[in-house]
Amino acid sequence: RLRIGILLSKYSEYQVDYISSESEIGKLIEEADLIIGAGITAYEGVLRRKPVIVVGDYGLGGLVTPDTFRKHYNNRFRGKINGVRNESFSLENLEKEIYKSFNLTFQELQMMSNQTITLQNI
């Protein structure tokens, strides 16, 4: 949490929240502009049409895009595709992914949300 806070400190309009209980997830995801997380948090973020950067037990998976969505979904949003457990990453790389997230369009977010719903029903 502290590292991300430092990374984003030059942007005073951003508020970084750490979700500590499952009961908070839905409400905070709905209010968020960007989700950084793994597993169900990342999944819910995609489902709710939010930009998602996957950071998990397997390192930095990066921004979920229409091109990477299926790989992240199949990897259960656990981190880097084909990564190793507890893989480290640089804050500079996370920062690059944050900047890339600003370029996702609503149509791209909607398409990934729809794919999530379709895959749920298979």
Predicted segments with their positions:
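Conserved catalytic-core segment of nucleotide-activated headgroup transferases in glycan assembly
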Residues: 1-10, 14
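Conserved active-site histidine-acidic residue motif and adjacent donor-binding/catalytic loop
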Residues: 2, 16-28, 40, 58
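A short acidic, amphipathic alpha-helical/loop segment
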Residues: 4-7, 28, 44, 48-50
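Extended, folded domain segments that form the structural surfaces/walls around functional sites
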Residues: 19-26, 97-101, 121
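An anion/phosphate-binding loop that grips the pyrophosphate of nucleotide cofactors and donors
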Residues: 32
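Catalytic binding pocket for nucleotide-activated donors in carbohydrate/polymer assembly enzymes
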Residues: 43-108
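A short N-terminal helical cap/helix-turn-helix that marks the beginning
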Residues: 98-99, 106-122
